């Protein structure tokens, strides 16, 4: 029979060894339901303990024109520089083991229960997802779905009873709305920007993925038709990326659905994550207990080119 541990100090080597197994499981865990990486580029570069990041932006201005051999009016190009900063903050979630749990695990030759650890891991990832999508009121951060400087329009009131809701529209009206949002980005940027990604509320994705354009047996769904008949694909020959975010179901005016069209690139939008999930070493808390936890550091979402994004509200009822 295994000898019982008399106190936490004696049990510490066993707990540390068990903690390494749990740490591996935490780092290997993936949470597809909290996939902020699918929505925007994630930046993990830089020192994980830095106060924040400082960045520089530039704007080029200039032109070329016809000149004579004796000209003295050569047009010169100019570069204007801007400077900004973004602060980081730390989040965390922990768990504990007591001497009773440790001795029982050792007695029966089993691993320490990792349920609390995996719950802490999920909680941390959930908070990162919430910060990435909706921001943080505590830190005065905005997220992917509620940037104040992104242009916002309302879906056309062309549905039944002048409704803007997609559920009250024909497939043709929905396709016009979706392409209208895609066209808004180049129109408002003098054709400099082009949205290559569309993020939809879950209920809108479900609707257009299951409603057919026509009544024929081989009729495509609205989603299938839109994938091949959208202005981005028509202009570039490349497929439009279409994704979802549950927070979009209540991000619009009045708590309704919101669609986001944007160019998914680092120079447009980024989620600062200098320290992804890090498991802390096991610490002996008392003579009968241990504690550890997970921390992460983030700076939230930063939109550097709001003109490369656009919102459309009124597409679905409040969730």
Tell what function each PLM region has.
Residues 96-176:
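Alpha-helical scaffold segments that mediate packing/assembly in large oligomeric complexes
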Residues 43-48, 56-61, 191-194, 199-213, ...:
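Short, flexible beta-strand-to-coil junctions
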Residues 93-95, 292:
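Oligomerization/assembly interface segments of phage tail-like spikes and tubes
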Residues 145-221:
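Extended, solvent-exposed, turn-rich assembly/linker loops in the middle of proteins
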Residues 1-39, 46-47, 210-319:
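Sequence/fold signature of self-assembling virion shell proteins
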Residues 98-100, 200-203, 305:
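Helix N-cap / beta->alpha transition motif
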Residues 15-93:
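Assembly/oligomerization interface modules of large self-assembling protein complexes
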Residues 124, 128-131, 178-189, 226-230:
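Hydrophobic, Leu/Ile/Phe/Ala-enriched alpha-helical segments that form helix-helix packing faces
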């Amino acid at each position: 029979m295994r000898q019982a541990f008399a106190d936490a100090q004696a049990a510490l080597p066993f707990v540390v060894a068990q903690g390494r197994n749990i740490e591996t499981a935490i780092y290997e865990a993936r949470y597809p339901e909290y996939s902020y990486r699918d929505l925007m580029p994630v930046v993990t570069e830089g020192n994980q303990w830095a106060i924040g990041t400082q960045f520089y932006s530039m704007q080029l201005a200039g032109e070329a024109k016809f000149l004579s051999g004796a000209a003295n009016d050569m047009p010169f190009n100019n570069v204007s520089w801007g400077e900004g900063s973004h602060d980081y903050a730390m989040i965390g979630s922990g768990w504990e083991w007591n001497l009773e749990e440790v001795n029982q695990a050792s007695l029966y030759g089993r691993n320490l229960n990792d349920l609390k650890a995996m719950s802490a891991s999920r909680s941390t990832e959930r908070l990162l997802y919430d910060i990435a999508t909706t921001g943080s009121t505590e830190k005065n951060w905005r997220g992917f779905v509620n940037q104040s400087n992104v242009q916002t329009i309302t879906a056309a009131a062309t549905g039944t009873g002048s409704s803007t809701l997609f559920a009250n529209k024909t497939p043709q009206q929905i396709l016009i709305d979706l392409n209208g949002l895609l066209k808004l980005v180049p129109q408002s940027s003098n054709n400099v920007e082009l949205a290559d990604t569309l993020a939809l509320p879950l209920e809108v994705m479900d609707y257009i993925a299951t409603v057919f354009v026509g009544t024929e047996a081989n009729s495509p769904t609205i989603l299938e038709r839109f994938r091949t008949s959208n202005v981005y694909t028509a202009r570039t020959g490349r497929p439009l990326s279409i994704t979802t975010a549950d927070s979009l179901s209540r991000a619009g005016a009045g708590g309704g659905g919101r669609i986001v069209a944007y160019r998914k690139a680092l120079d447009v939008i980024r989620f600062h994550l200098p320290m992804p999930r890090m498991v802390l070493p096991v610490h002996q808390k008392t003579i009968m207990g241990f504690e550890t936890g997970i921390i992460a550091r983030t700076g939230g979402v930063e939109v550097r080119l709001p003109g490369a994004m656009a919102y459309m509200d009124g597409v679905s009822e409040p969730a």
